[in-house]
């Protein structure tokens, strides 16, 4: 799932290109990121839920209390986005991402 970057009342700064891999588990998401790296495409995960951070755990926050945050986190993949990407780079990223997601999810 790719969220739109523009709408009637908003426009993205295009700082990050975040996708969600519907139906992917935490482990499958990790496998997708690893396979993309093997193809030369560096992906990442942004916005780790606060209850997963040690400081918040030490204050008593528990991930179980925030199921929606975890659900978004577990299958989120951030694709490369920067001003030096050529059209060919974008095509390469998209093609490989689609192939890898299909390979991992079957």
State the predicted function of each range.
Residues 1-106:
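PLP-dependent aminotransferase class I/II
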């Amino acid at each position: 799932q790719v969220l739109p970057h523009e709408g009637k009342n908003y426009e993205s700064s295009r700082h990050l290109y975040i996708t969600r891999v519907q139906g992917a588990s935490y482990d499958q998401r990790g496998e997708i990121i690893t396979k993309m790296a093997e193809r030369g495409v560096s992906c990442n995960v942004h916005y780790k839920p606060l209850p997963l951070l040690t400081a918040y755990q030490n204050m008593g926050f528990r991930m179980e209390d925030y199921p929606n945050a975890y659900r978004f986190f577990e299958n989120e993949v951030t694709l490369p986005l920067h001003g030096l990407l050529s059209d060919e780079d974008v095509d390469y990223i998209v093609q490989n991402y689609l192939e890898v997601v299909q390979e991992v999810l079957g």
